[in-house]
Amino acid sequence: MRMYDLILKKRQGKPLTKDEIQWMIREYTDGRIPDYQMSALLMAICFQGLDKEETYELTMAMARSGEMLDLSQIQGIKVDKHSTGGVGDKTSLALTPIVASLGIPVAKMSGRGLGHTGGTIDKLESIPGFSTQLEDDAFEEQVNSICISIMGQTKDLAPADKLLYALRDVTATVDQISLIASSIMSKKLAAGADAILLDVKTGSGAFMKEESDAIQLAKEMVEIGKSAGRKMTAVITNMDEPLGMAVGNILEVKEAIDTLKGNGPDDFVELIETLASHMLILGGAVKDFDEGLMRVRESIQSGKALDKFKQFVAAQGGDTKYIDHPELFEQADIIEEIRSEQDGFVGSIDAQEMGICSLILGGGRETKESVIDPTVGLVFSKKVADPVKKGDVLATIYGNDEEKVKQAVLHFKENYHIIEEKPTKPIMIREVLS
């Protein structure tokens, strides 16, 4: 088999076979196919596309390029959740303890943040003492014992995807939907769960800006998962404005704790309740969405979800006094309120640019080596469609460097718009696919 022939075949719009795809991924991962040939194939895929079989075989070849986690020692139906990422996306922090408190085992691997999107691991590690570095045995034992564990992704998980993604990043081949679907699903399938819930974001702060693209991506990922024998549900959700009120690691952890105490912002609560209900259906704990919703609300109101979060934090070395008393968390030195200069309504908040505000303050990574400041970020007081009077606080900026705070305030004002007429409130849940 020659890589030249595969490039030519795909350039002509012909489908690659299972054997060809497996050979290509194996040879590339082992360093026997050069980047220039793989780049040529990726560009041919961008122009000619992949059919369902090719997308599935590419996903499985990448999943099998490294360790495939075996979670069979964990009792029950293991349900994983993946978000395509956004700004203020602290979903896993509140969602996982809720479903774990209702008996669904959560054995989750999460990543760090890069660019304007924050990572679950960074947020958890802002809790003093919390460790995400676990051995496989300890990870499994913890899930069997308390129904929940979240650990950092290991380097052995889908190494072919890591190599391909780095190449796609520098060859303008990132945004091909089948390549995105196979990249995400290769890691999810390698992580060993029985069922997967996908939270596919759409809007200005999402990877998929257009809703039609988000739906197409969700459909392809659901198809791949089902072909691999997994139970699948995808929920298309809004990311035109930041999720909840807080953006920044410690600020988001505090908001997740508030939500588990029953005091979360409306949009975040709606998202959490919806995703948790679908996870309960996937895990076989409830018959339908309404029953799931009732049980999720009970878990929060009774304090079971918060207790489970504390149990989870303690099991991974975290200090639970910060959960009981979030005011103990370290706070930024500079706190600056941004006030409205006019009456009206909040017309739009560019989610991606608000993520950039957090990045300017030091709350994100410019490169993989960047060190994050967990104390910085912003907390909104007014969201889209809220009425505003002149002098009202729109948001509060948290920073540790006066120059960076000035830049962030300027950037905020350029991307937060007040209008005279009340706009329509954004719809959080756009569509559910399974």
Regions found by a protein language model. Name each.
Residues 1, 10-73:
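N-terminal glycine-rich anion-binding loops that anchor highly charged ligand groups
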Residues 5, 10, 15-18, 28, ...:
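Well-ordered secondary-structure scaffolds
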Residues 47, 93-107, 187-192, 224-228, ...:
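Alpha-helix C-terminal capping segments
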Residues 49-110, 114:
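Active-site cofactor/substrate anionic-group-binding motifs, chiefly glycine-
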Residues 87-96, 100-101, 108-109, 115-118, ...:
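Short glycine/serine/threonine-rich phosphate/pyrophosphate-binding segments
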Residues 109, 143, 151-154, 199-203, ...:
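Short beta-strand segments
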Residues 123-149, 219-225, 229:
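A glycine-rich helix N-cap at a beta->alpha junction
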Residues 144-193:
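Phosphate/diphosphate-binding glycine-rich loops and adjacent basic-rich segments that engage nucleotide
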